[in-house]
Amino acid sequence: MKVLVTGVEGYLGVLLAAVLMERGHEVVGLDTGFYRDGWLYNTDMARFVSCINMDIRHITEETLQGYDAVVHLAELSNDPLGQLRPKITYDINHMGTVTLVNKCKLVGIERFVYTSSCSVYGVGAESYQTEASAPHPQTAYAKCKVLVERDLAAMADDDFSPTFLRNATAYGPSPRMRFDLVLNNLAALAWTTGEIKMTSDGTPWRPLVHVLDICEAIACTLEAPREVIHNEIFNVGDTRENYQVKEIAQIVAETFPGCQLT
């Protein structure tokens, strides 16, 4: 399968590309290149057939010719960034994605994997959130996820199959590291300062999922029979990896010798 991965130079994208290539897929990347410098460790980006330097809002039908599937990761990627400039978040994350999908349909791309988020559930009243739970997005980032799911679902037809993966909070190493994610952030503090200072009571829950497990979920979605994934939503995570923030902090502090938790 020939796959276009948008946001390929990001935290998830660079790992996903390697996973897909290892499974025999032909991968082409697309990225703005804003964060091209500052790799945490070396990786062989030269293995890409090509990496297109482009904003998704400017992508053309010509650029999209010849792909079997698109995995869309290229968005403004967290709540604080989304709240800083909500209009830009909507322009890129919502309208940029819808425009991209319209062009995908025009050129005959049959599969589109959209990386949504568990943040669409907001503060849930139920003990656990399932794919059938009603979304209650609290931020511009989460609201855009819900809008994209709604609009893309309406575009599904016999020739176009979108799939929505609501990922839990990612953790784990990547050449393009993110330290704004809760577990990664606490591990960075433990390593660099030897101390984790709790700034709240730590009672909020965080569903976690390893970044490579997200990659595997995406790969399995691409390879699954069409009737299984057509216009479906899947939570990507494991109930056993739901933790309160204070529990995550305790585990991290115990993992790094000499780290103090205050």
Describe the residue ranges of each PLM region.
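C-terminal substrate-binding subdomain of Rossmann-fold SDR/epimerase-dehydratase oxidoreductases
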Residues: 194, 199-262
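Short-chain dehydrogenase/reductase
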Residues: 90, 138-146, 180-181, 207-208
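Active-site Tyr-X1-5-Lys
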Residues: 123, 138-163, 191-192
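Short alpha-helix in the Rossmann-fold core of NAD(P)-dependent oxidoreductases
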Residues: 75, 85, 92-97, 113-116, ...
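Conserved beta-loop-beta element that borders a ligand/cofactor-binding pocket
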Residues: 116-117, 149-174, 184
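NAD(P)H-binding glycine-rich loop region in Rossmannoid oxidoreductase-like domains
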Residues: 56-92
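Conserved Rossmann-fold NAD(P)-dependent oxidoreductase catalytic core, especially the SDR/UDP-sugar
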Residues: 98-140
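N-terminal Rossmann/SDR dinucleotide-binding element
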Residues: 1-69
